Amino acid sequence: MSKLGVVLFVFLLLLPLAAPQPVGDQPADQPADRNAEARARFLHPFQYYTLYRYLTRFLHRYPIYYIRY
């Protein structure tokens, strides 16, 4: 192996493996998790429109669901 190959091998493969892995429950990660939960509950206005479109297509395709008992 050439010197450049050894240097690339050390810096690109061995150093990332030896670096300490980040801990998942650090305080910096918690606000991002809360924001992800809030974004999961929020529907964009266009999503309401697509939901309405799918429901109207479904009800036109299967009119038996219009019947109320």
UniProtKB/Swiss-Prot annotation:
Annotated tissue distribution: Expressed by the venom duct.
Propeptide part(s) removed at maturation, as residue ranges: 21-69
Primary location class: secreted
InterPro entries hit by this protein: Conotoxin (IPR004214)
Signal sequence region: 1-20
Molecular function per GO: ion channel inhibitor activity; potassium channel regulator activity; sodium channel regulator activity; toxin activity
GO cellular component labels: extracellular region; host cell postsynaptic membrane
Keyword set, alphabetical order: Ion channel impairing toxin, Ionotropic glutamate receptor inhibitor, Neurotoxin, Postsynaptic neurotoxin, Potassium channel impairing toxin, Secreted, Signal, Toxin, Voltage-gated potassium channel impairing toxin, Voltage-gated sodium channel impairing toxin
Localisation: Secreted
UniProt-listed Pfam families: Conotoxin (PF02950)
Keyword Secreted among record annotations: yes
Role of this protein: Tyrosine-rich conopeptide that targets several channels/receptors that are expressed in Xenopus oocytes. These targets are the voltage-gated potassium channels Kv1.6/KCNA6 (IC(50) is 170 nM) and Kv1.2/KCNA2 (IC(50) is 2.0 uM), Nav1.2/SCN2A (30% of inhibition), and N-methyl-D-aspartate (NMDA) receptor (GRIN1/GRIN2A/GRIN3B and GRIN1/GRIN2B/GRIN3B) (15% of inhibition). In vivo, causes the marine worm N.virens to move very slowly in contrast to control worms, and causes seizures (at 5 nmol) and death (20 nmol) to mice when intracranially injected.
Family to which the UniProt record says this protein belongs: Belongs to the conotoxin M superfamily. Conopeptide Y family.
Remarks, miscellaneous: The mature peptide does not contain cysteine residues.
Protein name (Swiss-Prot/TrEMBL): Conopeptide Y-Pl1
